[in-house]
């Protein structure tokens, strides 16, 4: 599997498909069954910086780490990435996650990424490091991205992208690739028990603010777009949640 993934990610035309192979692994196995390989996987990904200029690559990467979070938890994701390079997770959030959140499309994918992003800001919000000004800004901008994803119509936040599918000839025709890739591309909801990611978001924020009253309204006022502040307030009213 690791060999297939590395070949795909290194391919000039099929790089993002490597993430769909890994999604199958993440969804199928317990963490301790592939934990040993995780640092190598992240090292392979971060060793392809030029690939992150491609929107498809980044979106597939966000889907991968979102699957990771909802199946195995935020702490394991953060710790495993930072074991490869100190504080690289913060760079991932700042340079990749936040700018590309609004580009996620598809009902299942949107719910997955929104819930995973909510769990990340909840995790970060509970960390003492949130008091660092740089982390406060990161948290606020990520929340702004989540609200954009959940409240803006798709046509207002996503530029139309031409759909193109490439299969690397030296990888894509192997039985291993075909099985893993096709399994990952099935339209299966990994969060069947969650009906509304908007409710998940405001409930999480209400929980954080009840533990740390006075902290989050100031961050929201500073870092959320005014339209997103209004949208968040409307969501809080809809679900009867307060951010204090």
Per-range role (PLM):
Residues 1-244:
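Alpha-solenoid helical-repeat scaffold
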């Amino acid at each position: 599997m690791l060999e297939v993934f590395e070949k795909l990610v290194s391919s000039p035309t099929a790089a993002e498909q490597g993430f769909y192979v890994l999604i199958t692994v993440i969804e199928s196995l317990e963490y301790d069954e592939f934990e040993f390989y995780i640092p190598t996987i992240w090292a392979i990904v971060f060793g392809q910086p030029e690939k992150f200029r491609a929107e498809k690559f980044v979106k597939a990467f966000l889907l991968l780490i979102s699957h990771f979070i909802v199946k195995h938890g935020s702490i394991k994701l953060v710790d495993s990435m930072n074991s490869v390079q100190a504080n690289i997770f913060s760079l991932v959030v700042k340079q990749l996650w936040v700018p590309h959140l609004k580009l996620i499309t598809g009902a299942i994918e949107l719910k997955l990424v929104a819930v995973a992003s909510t769990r990340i800001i909840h995790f970060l919000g509970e960390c003492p490091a949130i008091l660092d000004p740089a982390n406060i800004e990161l948290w606020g901008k990520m929340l702004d991205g989540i609200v954009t994803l959940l409240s803006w119509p798709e046509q207002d936040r996503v530029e139309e992208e031409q759909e193109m599918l490439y299969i690397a000839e030296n990888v894509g025709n192997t039985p291993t690739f075909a099985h893993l890739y096709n399994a990952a591309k099935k339209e299966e909801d990994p969060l069947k028990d969650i009906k509304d990611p908007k409710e998940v978001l405001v409930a999480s924020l209400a929980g954080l603010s009840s533990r740390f009253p006075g902290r989050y309204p100031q961050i929201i006022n500073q870092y959320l777009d005014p339209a997103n502040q209004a949208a968040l307030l409307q969501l809080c009213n809809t679900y009867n949640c307060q951010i204090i």
